[in-house]
Amino acid sequence: MTEQELIKAALAEDLAGGVDITSQATIAADATSVADFVARMDGVIAGINIAHAVLAEVGLTDVTLFKKDGDQVKVGDVLITVRGNTRAILLAERTALNFFGHLSGIATLTSKWVAAVSGTKCQVRDTRKTTPGMRTIEKYAVRMGGGTNHRMNLSDAALIKDNHIAAAGGVVAAFTQVRSAYPKAEIEIEVDNLAQLKEVLPQQPDLVLLDNMSPELCAQAVALAKGTCKLEASGGISIASARAYAQSGVDYIAIGALTHSAPVFDIGLDLRAE
């Protein structure tokens, strides 16, 4: 889904009954207010432009952005100020905060992983473990936190995993079938042990995914590969162990948690009279 489609769908979800009955009952139709979006915690933000687009979608045009995506913010920082119709502000509030808080949570978590491997050549990469319909914006948030994107979709590159290997009859068989069918595609192949790595290296893969290997085994894999392909560690990696994996010499660590387990970044909306 496009960003605009997501916004329209989210607002429609809130107005499924046709009207905000609380605002309708308590706020005059022509009432105006000023509202500030305020950071309730420290972190890295993403989604400020989406929050802005939500406000625009309900007709709010007097909007000031004080920060930009990728900025480090602190508790109490005012991120956005909006002036306009009070009912419209409250209609947009939850949808804007949902997007803004979710994406800033991803950016903030990603920045912590990136900090954990700082000073090494290792990059933190995301996965396709994203919220259905929100992959593009979630992967954008990863970039804002300093991370790197893996595939956006199944056509971007080949990633031969254990089920493909089982179906094809082995590591080499799976690789050669993909290479034959898509000779120009980037191919990454998953291996569970060093024996599989030794088997696939002569096929000259672009990348090899080291699945659930310890940092020590990853270091051995790096020595075996001798720089002939990129190596990515995946599975069983915590933020506490990330540096050990990075220091093993792998090029990437794949972290599904960046998008599937990021806590929401706390942002509040404070309304005040005009």
Regions found by a protein language model. Give the residues of each.
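Cytosolic regulatory modules rich in charged/polar residues
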Residues: 234-235, 253, 270
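Short, charged, intrinsically disordered terminal tails
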Residues: 257-274
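Short secondary-structure boundary segments
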Residues: 212, 235, 257-258
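Acidic/glycine-rich phosphate/pyrophosphate-binding loops and surrounding catalytic core
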Residues: 1-203, 207, 216-224, 230-232, ...
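Cys/His-rich Zn2+-binding cysteine-cluster or related metal-binding knuckle/ribbon modules and their
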Residues: 239
